[in-house]
Amino acid sequence: MDSPFLSIIVPVYNGESWVTPAVDGILSQTRPSFELIAIDDASRDATSNILTECCREDSRIRVLTHKTCLGAGPSRNDGMDIARGKYLLFLDADDLFEPNLVESVATEAERIDADMVLFGADEFETEGEWRSNRFFLVSDLVPAAAPFNRNDIPNRLFQLCTPEPWTKLFRRDFAMENGLRFQGLQNTNDMLFTLSGLALAARVGAVPDVLVHHRVGRPGSIQASRGRDSLAFLAALRAVKQRLEVEGLFDQLAESFANLVVFHCLFNDDAPASWAEVFAELGVSGLPEHAFWLDGDYERYTRLVLASWEEGNGLACAYGKDFWYKAALLERADLERSAQRADELQRRADDAWRETELVKASLSFRVGSTLTAPIRKLRER
C-alpha cells in the first residue's frame, strides 16, 4: 500500500457527542491523501462503536484502543509510532476544521520542503460563543520570507505561536530523528514536543488562515478525566529548558524562553511557594524591561518575584482577564494592517487607472490607434 502524504492523529476519550463531526470534517477535506489514526483512550461511552463504524465506511481510518486511560500525550505518541505519512497533523476530537485545512498546510509544506508549518485557529464554546485568539499564530512576528527558523526570530521564537499541537504540521522524519515526544503530564503535555520542534526546525512555514476551530470549556476531556495538575506547566518548562541546553540553543533563545516562562507563570491558575525560586531555576532572573514582548509584563514579573503565594494567585487571575484584552489588541492590529493594505491596493489601482486614461488621451496614442486600425480589422476577419 502506498504511503499517504499525511497522517492525522486524533486522541479520543468519551467523545461520543463530538467525534462524529470531527471525523466528518477530516474525511471531507479537499485534499484526500491522508490516513486518520484515532486513538480511543479507554473511553467508557460509545466512542469505540462509533470509530469502528467509521473504519468500515472509510479505509483511510485506523483505530488504536487503550485498555487504560493514558492521556493525550501518550496517545499522540502511540499514533505517531504507527504513522506512515510524510507529515504529521495532530488534531483534537472535539474540534471543527475548515475543509481546506489539509490542502493549505500541505501546499505550504511542499512549497518550502518544510520541517514544520504553523497555521491559525480560533475558539468556540459548545453554547455557541466564538472568539478569535491571535496568540495561536501571531502574524506580526512571522518573518516575511519563508522558510524561516530560529535564527530569523531568536528573541521572539516562542511568542510566534502557542504550544498546542493542533496548529502545527510536522515532517515525520524530522520529528523522529530529533526524538520529539509528548510528555505524560496531566496537562501541558504538548509544550516539550512543539517548542523543541520549533527550536530545532531548519525550515518553518506559516499559513495565516484560521483552519481549526477549537472547542473550549468542555468537561470530560482526556485531561479532565485524569485530574488536573495546575503546576504541570513547570515540569514542561523545565523539560524545554533542558532540551535547549542539550542542543546548545538556550543562550540564543534565552530571551524568548524567559517571555514564555513569565507568560505561563502569570496565566496559571495556581502558584508555587516561591516564584523567585522558580524564575531562578528556569534561568530567567533579573530580566531587563526591554526583554519583554507584551506591555505590562515587566511590571507584573517584578511584582511576581516578590509576591507571596496569595499575591501570586491574585496576579495570575488579573492577568487572565488582561490576556483577552491583549488578544483583542492583536486582532485589531491585524485588521488595521489589512485595512492599510486594502487602501494601498486601491491607491495603486487608482494611479494605474489615471495613467491609463492619460495614455489614451495622449496624441501619440490616438495617432497609433488610427494607424493600426486597418491591421486590427484584418485580424478580426
List where the protein language model places each region.
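Cell-envelope/extracellular polymer assembly enzymes that use nucleotide-activated donors
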Residues: 4-7, 35, 192
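Short, acidic, metal-binding catalytic loop of nucleotide-sugar glycosyltransferases
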Residues: 24-33
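Conserved short acidic donor-positioning loop in nucleotide-sugar-dependent glycosyltransferases
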Residues: 26, 41-42, 70, 93
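A conserved acidic beta->alpha catalytic loop
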Residues: 40-50, 68
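Glycine-rich, basic loop-to-helix element that forms the pyrophosphate-binding segment
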Residues: 66-83, 96
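Donor-binding/catalytic cores of nucleotide-activated saccharide
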Residues: 72, 93-207, 212-229
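Short aromatic/hydrophobic "clamp" motif used to bind/position activated sugar donors
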Residues: 88
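Boundary detector for helix-to-coil junctions that initiate low-complexity/charged tails
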Residues: 307-381
